[in-house]
Structures are given as structure tokens and as C-alpha cells.
């Protein structure tokens, strides 16, 4: 199994290469480099304790890799990419529910307002046939954010960054494109995925459980 330090070097090298590909408009290099950082996280988690939580986070990362590839291909595969990330959010949601089922009403209200507001902004600019897929995605990511906030710790931070990244995608694609969007989107996405993956490591998961008063991950 690759050492964590080697995986980190690989992820950072691929991330740098992808940023370069964005700046130079090199589609092939972008396609090859984009999924590598999340693949490195998948490999890294193989060394974490084999808990149900780790399993669901790993599944979510796997679907995220599929989404990365689909959205990097120079074709209109947005709906397929959306579906892949929808599955990723559902996997994360399942993992978070395995940690705690406490209602966390403030988190629920915040997540619902966030999802409704974002969907409202996007719909007001015309989603057309994408309205239903985007609405379903907004529902899934809002539920994922709610349960992540209920868990606290790195899970909450990662989910928040993931939602921010997806919000930037929606704004750039449907509302008002802006030059810095590709860079802000990918950086918040990678940081979010790193935080989510880190929450599945032994030390981070223990911290989450202590903060949330949840039951042991091992019993899920």
C-alpha cells in the first residue's frame, strides 16, 4: 500500500498539473489530472480502520471520481456528472446517519434554507429541462449538509466546502460566469473532499463522535 506521504505528493502534483491545464486550456491534461487527488484519498482511506463509516465515505469518493471524469470530458455530460455526484452525496449521507441520528434542528433549518435559496436563484435564471435533476440534487446535498453538520468536526467542514463548490458551479453555469470560477470551484471541492475523507480516519472520527455525542462508528 502506498505511504500517505507518497499519496500526498501524488495528489499535490496532480492538483498543480490540473491548475496548469485550466490556465493553458489543455483539455487532455485536465482530464488525466483531475480525478487523481480524489483517487489518492480513496487509496489513503484503505489504511484507515475498516468501519461502516469509512466504507460509505470511500463509496462516496468513488462516485466523486466518476463525476470528476464525466465533467472533465469535452462533451455535454453534465447530467451524468450530476448523477454521479448525487450518488456521492447519498453515500456520504448514509455514512453520517451511521454516526448520529440526532435531529440537529438548527442544522436542518440552515441546510434547508441554503438548498432552497440556491435552487431559487438557479431556477430564476432558467434551468429548463434541468429543473428536476437540479432540484433532486439540491435536496440530496441539503440532506447531506444537515447530517454532516449534526456530526460536526471535519465532516461538517468538508460538507460545507463541498456545498460551496457546488454553489459556485451553479452560479457560474446558470447565473453569471466569472473568470475565477474554475479555480475556486476545484480548490473548495478538493479541500472539502479532503476534510470528508479525513473524518473517516481514526483520530478524526473519534473527535467527531465526542463532539456530537454519537454512538460508536464501529457499531453502525
What are these regions (language model features)?
Residues 1-220:
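Polytopic alpha-helical membrane-helix bundles and their juxtamembrane interface segments
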Amino acid at each position: 500500500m502506498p505511504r500517505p506521504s507518497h499519496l500526498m505528493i501524488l495528489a499535490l502534483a496532480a492538483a498543480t498539473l490540473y491548475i496548469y491545464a485550466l490556465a493553458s486550456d489543455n483539455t487532455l491534461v485536465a482530464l488525466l489530472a483531475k480525478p487523481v487527488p480524489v483517487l489518492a484519498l480513496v487509496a489513503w482511506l484503505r489504511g484507515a480502520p475498516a468501519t461502516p463509516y469509512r466504507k460509505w465515505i470511500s463509496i462516496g469518493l468513488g462516485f466523486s471520481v466518476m463525476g470528476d471524469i464525466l465533467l472533465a470530458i469535452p462533451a455535454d455530460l453534465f447530467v451524468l456528472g450530476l448523477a454521479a455526484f448525487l450518488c456521492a452525496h447519498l453515500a456520504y449521507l448514509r455514512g453520517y446517519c451511521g454516526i448520529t441520528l440526532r435531529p440537529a434542528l438548527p442544522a436542518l433549518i440552515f441546510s434547508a434554507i441554503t438548498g432552497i435559496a440556491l435552487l431559487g436563484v438557479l431556477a430564476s435564471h432558467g434551468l429548463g429541462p434541468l429543473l428536476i435533476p437540479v432540484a433532486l440534487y439540491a435536496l440530496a446535498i441539503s440532506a447531506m449538509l444537515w447530517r454532516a453538520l449534526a456530526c460536526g468536526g471535519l465532516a461538517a467542514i468538508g460538507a460545507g466546502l463541498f456545498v460551496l463548490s457546488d454553489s459556485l458551479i451553479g452560479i457560474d453555469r446558470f447565473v453569471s460566469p466569472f473568470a475565477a470560477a474554475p479555480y475556486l470551484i476545484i480548490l473548495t471541492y478538493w479541500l472539502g473532499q479532503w476534510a470528508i475523507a479525513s473524518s473517516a480516519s481514526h483520530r478524526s472520527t473519534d473527535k467527531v463522535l465526542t463532539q456530537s455525542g454519537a454512538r460508536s462508528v464501529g457499531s453502525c
